[in-house]
Amino acid sequence: MRLYIKHTAAVIFFIFTMLTLHAQKASEYQVKADFLFNFSKFLEWPSIALGQPNEPFVVGILGNDPFGNYLDEITAGEKIMDRPMVVKRFNSIHDIDKCHILFINLPGESSEVLNTLKGKSVLTVSDEQDFNRNGGIIRFYSDNDTIRLQINLDAAKTANLNVSSKLLRIAKIYE
């Protein structure tokens, strides 16, 4: 038990340190890309959403890609749940066949996208102001030059995603 507490404290310390250092040295979207990469370690998807064991774990970007090549670079060669992690870019919600984490960058259109994805096990992420209110799961926001998270637990439950308590500790819960 003591080892578990030390491990949890170390993970939380690492995340806060990463946030602070990256906010100072990296661009805003590099920090957000790091989060997208790491979200997969703090959520559980139902096995049916993961598909066959040989299928990749897909991080998607819908709309304009603000990450450049950075997200591709940090995910190259990485595995999530023994699956290769791949980044895919989509111009339309209708182009998405399989996606596990989706960053939505379609200002003013996220509500329509979220309605289309409702009930599917996709972690939806955006930095749009009303994202959580519209049914999005994780919203990035800035607080004193630090990237923070706001999580809509009802939306996560609707998507059949289990959010780790470790992630919840560093996030603001949307109510």
Regions found by a protein language model. Name each.
Residues 2-10, 21-175:
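Short hydrophobic alpha-helices and adjacent helix-cap/hinge residues
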Residues 13-19:
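Sec-dependent N-terminal signal peptides of Gram-positive bacterial secreted proteins and lipoproteins
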